[in-house]
């Protein structure tokens, strides 16, 4: 499993993100859509390293 970060814009204009665990980018997008986010605009960041970011943040 890989960790994917999806940065997206909600229909009301607010920006948000979702972290998804999946084997492939295509599966991550399907999980995102199945969560009720189909049709929302967004960007997919592959293999996001959460541990590296949390260590840098604090």
What are these regions (language model features)?
Residues 35-58:
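Short, mixed-charge low-complexity intrinsically disordered segments
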Residues 1-15:
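Short aromatic-glycine-(Arg/Gly/Cys) micro-motifs in beta-strand/loop hairpins
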Residues 31-32:
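Short, composition-biased linear "edge" segments at structural boundaries
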């Amino acid at each position: 499993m890989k960790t994917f970060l999806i940065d997206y814009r909600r229909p009301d204009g607010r920006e948000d993100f979702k972290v998804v665990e999946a084997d492939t980018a295509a599966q991550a997008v399907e999980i995102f859509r199945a969560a009720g986010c189909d049709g929302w605009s967004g960007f997919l960041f592959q293999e996001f390293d959460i541990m590296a970011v949390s260590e840098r943040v604090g």
